[in-house]
């Protein structure tokens, strides 16, 4: 397939009032058809929305509306059987703290994508191709 799988920290950066210039510039330089999200990223952000909802339901609704737009704007890849099997291979003898990263990484692995993240160390530990757009400026 080729292309890029955006990690949760990249998607979250886009929600900021002033997202990092390197992230914005890099995203603008890549064709939309080459940008992907894992369903896991949507789940991670939704989990954060639910925590926010306990303190500030209005803000949670705003973020949830934003997340709906994000989900519609990107190619979202599911956690299917092949991806879960790749996840199990990546997780073998690894720390349980890498669960979500390994699921995102498995999605990238199955689809031949580079993980775009600020969190290079954990994804490199899983043997994945990574790119950090925060360093692109």
Label the model's feature ranges.
Residues 131-137:
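Generic C-terminal helix-cap and adjacent flexible tail
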Residues 1-37, 41, 51-67, 137:
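Short, well-structured N-terminal submotif of metal-dependent ribonuclease cores
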